[in-house]
Amino acid sequence: MIFHENFDVIVVGGGHAGTEAALAAARMGMNTLLLTHNMDTLGQMSCNPAIGGIGKGHLVKEIDALGGAMAQAIDKGGIQFRTLNSSKGPAVRATRAQADRALYKAAIQTTLQNQDNLKIFQQSCDDLIVENDRVTGVVTQMGLRFSAPSVVLTVGTFLGGQIHIGLENFKGGRAGDPPSIALADRLRELPFRVDRLKTGTPPRIDARTVDFSKMQEQAGDTPIPVFSFMGKPSDHPQQIPCYITFTNEKTHDVIRKNLHRSPMYGGVIEGIGPRYCPSIEDKIVRFADKDKHQIFVEPEGLTSYELYPNGISTSLPFDVQIEIVQSITGFENAHICRPGYAIEYDFFDPRDLKRSLETKFIDGLFFAGQINGTTGYEEAGAQGLIAGMNAALKVQGKESWTPRRDEAYVGVLIDDLTTLGTKEPYRMFTSRAEYRLLLREDNADIRLTEKGRELGLVNDERWQAYNEKMEVIAKEKQRIKDTWIHKDHTMIDQVNALLKTPLTREASLEELLRRPEIRYNDLMAIDGLGSEFTNQAALEQVEIHTKYAGYIVRQQDEINKQLRHEQTILPKEFDYKTVSGLSNEVVAKLIDARPDTIGQASRISGITPAAISLLLVYLKKQGLLRKSA
C-alpha cells in the first residue's frame, strides 16, 4: 500500500539524531515525516542521563545556535549544571548537565509536536525504495510505502543489534526494544562498507538501598549555567546533587576472577567499544596498576529512584554484577533495578559519505548518528541537524552546506569521519580541533546563527535576540575604547588597586582590560566605569575578544593561509594514477578515501605536503582548479 501523501524528507529513527534531523528539515519548510518504531520513546536517553561535557557541550551550543532542540530541552530537564574547566581559558570551558530523563524526553516530544510541517508515524522501517541509485522512499514493516526524494537514516544501535549479558546474548536495539534486522540486511545489499561496533551501559541501582553518607557529595554550580542562548536559569527544575564513590581491590578481584565469563574477553563480542568510555572489566585489565576507579553516582530524575553509576559499564553475568556493585562503598546493600549490558550493532564506513552526510552511492540518502560510527547524544544530534538540513537543501535544489573545521566542532566531527573514517566509536574532544580559541562554547551563536538564519533554521525570536546581543557587543566595545583613565583621574586609586604596577600614563578601558590581572567585572565595579548594559553573555564576549585579540588575529591568519586550497575540489572520478610523482602508497590511500577536496586529502594519514603539491600542479595544468561553495 502506498501512503496517500508524498513527503519532501523522511527521517527514520527518533533518537537524538533523528529528532534534530526532522526538526531541521521541517523548520526549513519541508513536508517532513519522522518514522519511529515507538512514539513513546522519541528523544529517549538510552544510556547516561546527562548532556554536554568537554567537546560535547560545544556541539550542543552549536546545535542551539542553528535553532536545534537539544540545549533548550536540557535547560528544561537539567537537574544539575556545572561548568567544566572553569579555571582554564574560555576555549576549553564546557557546560555539562545532569538530566531528569522524563523531563528531557517530554521537552523533546513537546518540541516535535509543536513543529509545523512535521508529521510523526509509528512503524519500523524495513526497506528502502531505490531506483537507478536514487532513494525514492521507504517501506515499513506492514508494507506501507512512503515516498520522498530525501531520506535520512538515524537508526542508532538498532541495525543488527545484539545484546550481551555474560555469555548469553539476544537480539535487541536496546534493552526493551527490538532490533532492526530487515533494514540491516537491506543496507548490506547496497555498496557500503559495513562493520560492527560495541557500546555498553552500567546496571541501574535503587537509590533507596544506597548509603550516601559514605560517599562524597558533588553539588552543581552557583550561579547555575544555561545551555541555550535563549535560556535562563528560571527554566531549570529543582537542582539536586550527584555523589562520588570508588571501586576497590575487592571489586577488582571479583572482576579478575570472572573475566572468562565476559563476552568481551571470551571472544563472543567482535565489535570495538568506545576508547574513552571503557567497561569496568576493560579498565581493570588495561589499568592493572590502579587500586581504585572513580564512580559518579548520578540520579536519573526528580521522580525516579534509579541511579546511574557512571564508571561501571559492564557486560559480565548478572550474578557477577551484583558482587561488583555490593563491593563498592555505599552500595553494600544496593539493589540492582536493571542489569548492565553490552550491545553490538552495524555501522557504515563514514568515508562513503559526502561532507553533507549524503551517501556517495545512493543519491538522496543521508546517514547521521551511530550508523556513522560515533558515540554520544551530542555527536548524534549535531550530525542529525546537518543531515536534515542538507536533505532539505537537496529537495530545494540548493548547494549543501557543512561548516568547515575552523567554523564549528560539528565541522571537525564530520570532516574527521568523512576523511579518516573510524575503527572505534568516535567521541568529540576539544583536542580534535586545531582552532580551539575560535571555536568556543560562548561564541557558537556568533559563528553560526547568521548562517542558520540564511538557511531557514533560525526563527524570528532567536534572530531578534541574536541581533540585540550583537548590538550590545558593538556598543560596549566602542565604549571601552573611547573611555580613558589618566593618572589624576578621580578613581585612579581604585584602578591602581587592580593593577600590578600603577598607571603612569593615560590608558583606555580597552587597554586596561588587556592586562592579564584585570577582570571586566572588577573594572566595571568602579564608580563611573560601569556599563549601562545588563546582557552578561554579550559583556563576556567583549572581555574575551579584548583579552585574546592578538591570539584571535594570529589564529585567523593561520586559517586564511590554510583556506587557500582547503576547498579546492578533487573531481569525483579523478584518476590519481595519472598524476606523475605520486607513490603507489599515496595513490592507494587516495583511491580508498576518495576525498572531496584538497583539504580533506591533506588530512589523510600518509598524504604528504609534497603529494598535495603534485595534485595542485596537476589540477592547474588540466584546468580543473575550482573551489566548492
UniProtKB/Swiss-Prot annotation:
Domain of life: Bacteria
Gene Ontology CC entries for this record: cytosol
Keyword field contains NAD: yes
Cellular location(s): Cytoplasm
GO MF, one annotated term: flavin adenine dinucleotide binding
Pfam families noted in UniProt: GIDA, GIDA_C_1st, SAM_GIDA_C
Paired cysteines (S-S): none
InterPro entries: FAD/NAD-bd_sf (IPR036188), GIDA_C_N (IPR049312), MnmG (IPR004416), MnmG-rel (IPR002218), MnmG-rel_CS (IPR020595), MnmG_C (IPR026904), MnmG_C_subdom (IPR047001), MnmG_C_subdom_sf (IPR044920)
Binding locations of NAD(+): 273-287
Cross-referenced Gene3D superfamilies: FAD/NAD(P)-binding domain, GidA associated domain, C-terminal subdomain, tRNA uridine 5-carboxymethylaminomethyl modification enzyme MnmG/GidA
Requisite cofactors: FAD
Keywords: Cytoplasm, FAD, Flavoprotein, NAD, tRNA processing
Alphabetical GO biological process terms: tRNA methylation; tRNA wobble uridine modification
Chain sites annotated for binding FAD: 13-18
Function statement: NAD-binding protein involved in the addition of a carboxymethylaminomethyl (cmnm) group at the wobble position (U34) of certain tRNAs, forming tRNA-cmnm(5)s(2)U34.
Record's subunit section: Homodimer. Heterotetramer of two MnmE and two MnmG subunits.
Homology family: Belongs to the MnmG family.
Protein known as: tRNA uridine 5-carboxymethylaminomethyl modification enzyme MnmG
Organism: Pseudoalteromonas translucida (strain TAC 125)
Biological classification of the source: Bacteria, Pseudomonadati, Pseudomonadota, Gammaproteobacteria, Alteromonadales
